């Protein structure tokens, strides 16, 4: 009899545990690679405070993530390192910004979450003694340095292209001359600099901080525009309320403190209405 009671008790406990696991909400977050460190820390805090929710984070270049969403990947929240990628999924944007008239953003959910800076960084020993973007320009013109930057579909690469154009530099000619190497996301560019395989690279100031790199110079808005990170709930989300709750949490004090510790700035005061 005692054995029977024990077996029944075990079965009841297993059933309860199974029910508890079944009730867990899985929230899929697509986020720019530059958010890896901060969002990984935030994920732990959020899951501890909300044990009924499990965050599944997919970090990559914003262009790659946008393509995955467009091709039908499951995504509840998308946080991009640039407006372009979200614009291309947002039906409320005009035809110039969303020429394919894609409609993946849940109406009313889009916000401007964070601001970052574009930074010039070098390996620890700064082999070329580069001191600024101005000096880098002259060195590139003379073919004296090797610079790493993001691919054309990567926001940090798009910002870097604008900086090159600001200085009147021809990216294609520099690449053909072997003076530019590329990374598929900002982490790859950062790694090239950390490993000393290039003389310098253009990354976000937050990635420089996370990698322990010194920022040599910071691009102004006149050089490449402001670096705004938009975020939105996706229209095909099966858990839109949970997705919105997480987005609201990201704007809160606890999450924003983590973002700001590595150099992000809150955009809450300028939030898109």
Identify the role of each PLM range.
Residues 72-74:
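Charged, often glycine-rich, active-site loop that binds/positions anionic groups
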Residues 76-80:
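Periplasmic-binding protein-like
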């Amino acid at each position: 009899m005692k054995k029977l009671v024990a077996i029944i008790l075990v079965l009841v406990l297993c059933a309860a545990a199974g029910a508890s696991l079944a009730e867990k909400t899985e929230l899929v977050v697509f986020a720019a690679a530059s958010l890896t460190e901060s969002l990984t820390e935030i994920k732990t805090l959020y899951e501890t405070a909300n044990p009924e929710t499990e965050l599944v984070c997919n970090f990559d270049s914003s262009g790659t993530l946008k393509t995955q969403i467009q091709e039908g990947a499951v995504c509840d929240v998308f946080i991009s390192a640039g407006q372009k990628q979200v614009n291309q999924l947002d039906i409320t944007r005009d035809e110039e910004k969303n020429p394919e008239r894609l409609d993946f953003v849940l109406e009313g959910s889009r916000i401007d979450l964070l601001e970052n800076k574009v930074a010039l960084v070098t390996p620890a020993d700064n082999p070329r003694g580069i001191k600024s973007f101005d000096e880098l320009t002259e060195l590139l013109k003379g073919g004296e340095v090797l610079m790493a930057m993001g691919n054309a579909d990567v926001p940090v690469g798009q910002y870097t292209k604008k900086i090159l154009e600001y200085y009147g530099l021809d990216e294609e000619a520099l690449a053909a001359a072997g003076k530019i190497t590329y990374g598929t996301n900002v982490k790859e560019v950062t790694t090239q600099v950390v490993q000393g395989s290039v003389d310098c690279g253009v990354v976000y100031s937050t990635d420089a901080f996370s990698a322990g790199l010194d920022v040599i110079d910071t691009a102004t808005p006149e050089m490449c525009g402001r670096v705004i990170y938009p975020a939105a709930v996706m229209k095909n989300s099966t858990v839109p309320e949970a997705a919105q709750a997480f987005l609201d949490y990201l704007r809160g004090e606890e999450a924003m403190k983590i973002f700001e510790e590595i150099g992000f700035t809150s955009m809450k005061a300028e939030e898109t209405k």
